Amino acid sequence: MARWSKTIAAAAILTVVLLVVAGCSSRSLTLDETKWQLAEWTVSSLKPSDFTITAEFANGQISGNGGVNGYSGPYKAGPGTAFAAGPLAGTLLAGPEPATRAESIYQTLLGQAKSYKVADGKLTLYDQGGNESLIYEQATR
């Protein structure tokens, strides 16, 4: 009888451990129906907060404002933390030099993003080397 109790207890513990591990496995976090405002980037002395740079995700599409022009195109998040955006299309408005330079930097970094993480109200995109490149804060709808 004691042997069966130990077997049942071991099976119960194993089940709990497997459920915990399965819950911690890498799953794709959906970005659909979220909107973000760019807060930081790691490659320029220009401050993203000086411009309106946004990203909105819905139905497999990313759209937003790059600082001067609107943009849109397909994106893919997953499997796991994999990320890809593009090809992107945009309007062709002219703008002041700092804003057009910021937009160019943004478009380049967005196109180079290979993975992502959502945590603490922030969306972080990483380049191929795993370096943070674009850091957004969740925007209100």
Protein language model annotation of sequence segments:
Residues A2-R141:
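Lipid interaction determinants
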